């Protein structure tokens, strides 16, 4: 469930390569992934261009190992009605025959600004999330 109390217009852009710029509609994002990584992924962002960022919609693997499956939801509108919104994120599998190595991990990311790692977006976005379930 999620409720996007406010999704606004980007009012910051540090020009670190984000696909949005000041004046564009920002997007929140909820993303999940199943990965088979041999170590933790290091991601850095802030005052310089981000390092280690990855998007499972654009790549099937990173240095740490393969991305087995992912689900993603971009939210580009503020919610209305004051009630949480139920949503299911279907998993898109890159590898349907992968055998567990014992290293499978679940990644869950919820961001008020999908491109916040790039220091671009709306500073006043508000996103609430609750009640994650893995249904299989």
Q: What is the role of each PLM region?
A:
Residues 1-7, 14-18:
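A short beta-strand element within beta-rich, extracytoplasmic domains
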Residues 27-32, 65-67, 88, 129:
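Hydrophobic core segments within long, regular secondary-structure runs in both alpha-
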Residues 2-5, 25-36, 99-116:
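Internal, hydrophobic beta-strand segments that form the core of beta-sheet-rich folds
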Residues 37-100, 122:
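Extracellular carbohydrate recognition and processing domains
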Residues 10-12, 117:
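Outer-membrane beta-barrel proteins
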Residues 13-30:
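Short coil-to-beta strand junction motifs in C2/discoidin
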Residues 81-83, 98-102, 112-136:
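Extracellular carbohydrate recognition
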